């Protein structure tokens, strides 16, 4: 397995798919990385030369991925909660942040149901 940005990427998959195993790199970013490195998207990871791997590593190192990106996202959420804006309050209460309805759904964000006794009359 090749190791890029501290992540073992699968050897048997195409490079463009393997790069998406790194947090912060999606398909579009992976395609841009490979275009800049001059590597074909159809190449398998096991067929990459050390030189090509080095180019890819160099490009990925310039991006904010994995731990740095996770840290930045969590700090952004913390900042929203500290300044007390609407989005911060929604994060603090564990409710959907982006305006979704909460009357019926939002179970992922709200957690399992907590039924209240004697609700029906």
Curated annotation (Swiss-Prot):
GO MF term (any one): tRNA binding
Pfam families: Ribosomal_S13
UniProt entry keywords in alphabetical sequence: Ribonucleoprotein, Ribosomal protein, RNA-binding, rRNA-binding, tRNA-binding
SUPFAM superfamilies: S13-like H2TH domain
Stored InterPro entries: Rbsml_uS13_C, Ribosomal_uS13, Ribosomal_uS13-like_H2TH, Ribosomal_uS13_bac-type, Ribosomal_uS13_CS
Any one GO BP annotation for this protein: translation
Biased composition (Basic residues): 106-121
Region (Disordered): 94-121
Cellular component, GO, one term: cytosol
HAMAP family associated with the record: Ribosomal_uS13
SUBUNIT field: Part of the 30S ribosomal subunit. Forms a loose heterodimer with protein S19. Forms two bridges to the 50S subunit in the 70S ribosome.
Assigned protein family: Belongs to the universal ribosomal protein uS13 family.
Cited function: Located at the top of the head of the 30S subunit, it contacts several helices of the 16S rRNA. In the 70S ribosome it contacts the 23S rRNA (bridge B1a) and protein L5 of the 50S subunit (bridge B1b), connecting the 2 subunits; these bridges are implicated in subunit movement. Contacts the tRNAs in the A and P-sites.
Protein name: Small ribosomal subunit protein uS13
Organism in which the protein naturally occurs: Anoxybacillus flavithermus (strain DSM 21510 / WK1)
